[in-house]
Regions:
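Non-catalytic DNA-recognition/assembly elements of restriction-modification systems
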Residues: 7-33, 147, 203-214
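Hydrophobic structural patches
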Residues: 8-10, 160-172, 194, 209
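Sequence-specific dsDNA recognition surfaces
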Residues: 22-71, 211
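A short beta-sheet element
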Residues: 49-54, 63-123, 141
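Short, solvent-exposed loop/turn positions at domain surfaces
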Residues: 60-63, 134, 166
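Short beta-strand/turn micro-motifs at beta-sheet edges
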Residues: 87, 133-138, 195-196
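A short glycine-rich beta-alpha junction/loop motif
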Residues: 93-100, 133-156
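Extended intrinsically disordered, low-complexity coil regions enriched in Ser, Thr, Gly, Ala
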Residues: 172-187, 199-200
């Protein structure tokens, strides 16, 4: 939220532009139809088809009040925006009335703003602008979020930052897969080492704890 951030990529030195979220996004208020794909927003994975999160559709049969989502829209959980529950949709579909759907007013890098909206400074702003007595009832609708001020870089710098973050996320994903593979290997190894057949073949020697601890 600084006009002159301390950490920037080489070649970018222009001051960030001050604006309101309402200058960047408008609310999409179009209502959907029952045959459109039902979407949901998760904290870690952003916008996902509900069928990939829950095997069974437990939503209301009457979806006439559900909101339309188009590819490229920013969608957030109105009651969990202060936790960073938002994402850019790669799908056309509908979401429950508990969500707010934002569509860009101008050309922006939407992925940049999805990451920006998860930063501690913005999370704190979302918390301050949310309405409700306790965290269980906090609610952040478009009339409140559009008033929040922030500083944003040029489109070129937005894209540079967005690509950098995406690259980091890809590398993190690869490392997680590696860790999962190592854990699986460890479980298999331990299962083999301590199986009944393995222990029967092993010769054992008794040690006292004081000997091991030396």
């Amino acid at each position: 939220l600084e006009k002159y951030p301390k950490l920037r990529f080489p070649g970018f030195d222009e001051p960030y532009m001050e604006c309101r979220i309402g200058d960047i996004y408008s609310e999409r208020s179009q209502r959907g139809a029952d045959d459109m794909e039902l979407l949901s927003v998760t904290l870690n994975d952003g916008v996902m088809p509900r069928s990939e999160i829950e095997g069974k559709d437990n939503s209301s049969e009457d979806k006439s009040n559900y909101k339309v989502v188009c590819k490229g829209d920013m969608v957030y959980n109105s009651m969990r925006m202060w936790q960073g529950a938002n994402g850019v949709s790669d799908y056309d579909g509908i979401v429950s009335p508990a969500y707010t759907v934002l569509m860009p007013n101008k050309e922006i890098d939407n992925r940049y703003f999805a990451s920006l909206f998860k930063t501690p400074n913005l999370i704190n702003e979302f918390r301050k602008y949310s309405q409700g007595l306790t965290s269980d009832t906090w609610n952040l609708k478009y009339p409140q979020i559009r008033s929040i001020r922030l500083y944003i870089p040029s489109l070129q710098e937005q894209h540079k930052i967005s690509v950098f973050i995406s690259t980091l996320e890809e590398r993190i994903g690869i490392q997680r897969q590696l860790v999962d593979s190592l854990k699986k290997y460890k479980r298999g190894l331990l299962s083999h080492l301590f199986s009944e057949k393995s222990t029967q073949r092993c010769t054992t020697k008794r040690y006292y704890f004081s000997e091991i601890a030396q």
